[in-house]
């Protein structure tokens, strides 16, 4: 059981909000008390005192039952309830470890009712091994299996033509604009891209961004959102940038080389899941299609014949159980290799439910400090999908959303 990770999710969430929003004394008091119980729980579990570890668990659940902290913070009430489900899962493990099977199953049922969805953890968790032959456990496991990202993606509704949104137009800043010339010259991208064909240039630029700007999903870089500032932020502080900032950086590099590109926010179906991933879609004149490019993982995807695929094609092939080949270079910060089973079939399957892009793709698209109005967003969603977390122009038409880039006149 990944107890430390489950507890850390809530604690880190509150700490992040406090550091950014400085919500005041009440937030501090809540986090300090929660951290106290967290420490007690970890120490008791580490020493094998499973029965005693249930007391701090109960205290944390009671805190979540009575708190109204969500009213003074950006944390939604539903997210707090989801975290309570994780605590009930830990409760189930404690009961199972002390031989109280009935109570363990009741706690596990409560966890599943609150939305627990980590199937791989549940099926492999040795803390629950005494429950595995029980019919109730098996029924709960089946419910959790239905929540697996690939299962959810396969049940998504289809897309549909959208005659009302044919006016949506994506634009790409010309490479000779002053700021993009600055990006190209600063990074010496003509040399980085090399003298090979278009696909080799696209991949070389991907490797360059991945190798020279570290990823840190938990860090919101204190910098302007452009490739030069983000690169210098990392080089100066040693702190990585998040996936959105990394994808913005690579998008500017492609645009500066005259290669149409967007950064794409890949979103999950679950409105309570605030974890998403941001990658790039890059236009290939050579293949006459968009390509799936992920600078966080130094990744692209091909079919069984070695042809590079688009984001739309990766999504479709996941749904239809068609072959997908993850490139051999796929890795996180050169520290952990990525596998198709986890990266594509689990992580990206969760985050390929719907997509958001900017209409205007340019240098510094989301300025924090400059007088630079943000471009409008566009969503691509399946028919009938309802999620108000991202309010912007919306279409169900993939031909509109993934339209071939038009050359600037």
Outline where the language-model segments fall:
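Low-complexity, Gly/Ser/Thr/Pro-rich intrinsically disordered linker/tail segments
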Residues: 319-409
